[in-house]
A protein has these predicted regions:
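Conserved non-catalytic scaffold segment of RNase H-like nuclease domains
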Residues: 1-109, 113-116, 131, 137-154
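Acidic two-metal-ion nuclease catalytic site recognized across multiple nuclease folds
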Residues: 1-5, 146, 157, 164-193
């Protein structure tokens, strides 16, 4: 596998995974959306051989099956290539699942969970658009509709790009940088902060 991620300095990288089954460690696709200082987005995705069985439910959800990953690299091989870039940046995930999956897959291969700096774009979306609570929510599916985002849901590269776009829209709407919006220690952020 050749990495298509420039060895560059990004504002942040959004990361999304798809899994083969209900086991969080069964990553079968990793997608990244690297956001440059001018807010251009470079998207990368790769299939991953989870070395596990696939559930029919997951295959229906993302369309990836055993035949697609047979010759794909394992998670440990992918992480070895991506670690130098990921470890230098804030990583955005849409919910806590992606971090859980990366940590679980790391443990499966016998190494500690990477000490990445994670920020949750759900938290950012909740702070930017609190009115969506109880009104469709802050999941990518509803944000796609509300923010008029164009992406194919349950493709890791597309979902990573969508999470990056959510963050960029929230920054523009609130006039506050993502790391202040997504900081769990901050109680509230407003357009006047």
């Amino acid at each position: 596998m050749h990495t298509m991620i420039p060895d560059d300095n990004f504002r942040f990288i959004a990361l999304d995974v798809e899994t083969a089954c209900s086991d969080a460690a069964s990553i079968c696709q990793i997608g990244l959306a690297c956001v440059w200082p001018d807010n251009r987005i470079h998207t990368f995705s790769t299939l991953v051989n989870p070395c596990s069985d696939f559930d029919a439910f997951n295959i229906r959800l993302h369309g990836i099956g055993p035949e697609h990953v047979r010759n794909a690299p394992r998670f440990d091989e992918v992480l070895d290539l991506l670690f130098p870039v990921l470890s230098r940046h804030h990583l955005v995930q849409h919910s806590n699942f992606d971090k859980q999956a990366v940590n679980a897959a790391s443990r499966t291969y016998g190494f500690d969970a990477p000490n990445f700096h994670w920020i949750d774009s759900v938290t950012i979306a909740r702070r930017a658009w609190p009115e969506l609570k109880g009104n469709g929510g802050h999941g990518l599916g509803n944000l796609k509709k509300v923010l008029k985002l164009d992406f194919h849901h349950h493709d890791a590269g597309e979902d990573a790009r969508a999470a990056a776009q959510v963050v960029l829209r929230a920054e523009a709407y609130l006039g506050v940088p993502f790391d202040r919006i997504g900081n769990p220690d901050r109680k509230a952020v407003s357009r006047h902060d």
